[in-house]
C-alpha cells in the first residue's frame, strides 16, 4: 500500500498605496512543502523473512516556493465618460525542489536538488469610452516541472553522480486583446488569445 505524510506551511504579505493617478501594490508569499512518500506490505503469504507492515520504499520531497511582486496602475485619462489606464505587474519567483530516497517502481536512488529563478511580467492597456471597453495585454508565465516529471524521466547514475532526462521549465508568452460593449439592456464581448 502506497501512503503519504504531507505538511505544508506558508505566508502571504501585501501592501497597497492608492493615489491619483497611480496605484501601487507590493507583496510576496512563501510556502514550504514536506512530503514523505512510502509503501508498505501489510501481509505477504508464506514469507519467513519479511515482517508484517514491511516498508519497501520511501522517498522524501521538499519544495520551497517564494515570490515577490510589484503592481502599478496608472490612470492616464480618468474622466466620467472616458478612461485610459496602463498597468504593469512584475513578479520574481524562486522554487527549490529537493528529493531523496528510493523510487517506488524500480527501487533506484532518487537524489536531486534543483533551483529555478523565474521573472513573470505582465503589462496592459485599457481604454473605456461610454459603453465601449478595449483591453490589450502581454504576459510571460513560467512553471517548474512537476514531481511526476522528475519521477518518470530522470535517471541518476550513482557511479558518476550525473543525471539524464532532466525536464525543463515551461515558459508561456500570452498575448490578449479584448473588446466589450455594455448597454443598459445587454452586453457583448469578444476576446482573442495567442499563446
Where in the sequence are the language-model features?
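Face-selective signature of the C-terminal outer-membrane beta-barrel domain
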Residues: 1-104, 124-128, 189
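Outer-membrane beta-barrel domain signature
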Residues: 2, 55-59, 110-112, 164-168
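Residues that define the transmembrane beta-barrel architecture of outer-membrane proteins
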Residues: 5-9, 62-66, 115-119, 171-175, ...
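Eukaryotic, compositionally biased intrinsically disordered regions
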Residues: 89, 180-182
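Surface-exposed extracellular loop regions of Gram-negative outer-membrane beta-barrel proteins
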Residues: 94-103, 113, 127-175, 187, ...
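Short, flexible/disordered intra-domain loops and linkers
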Residues: 106-108
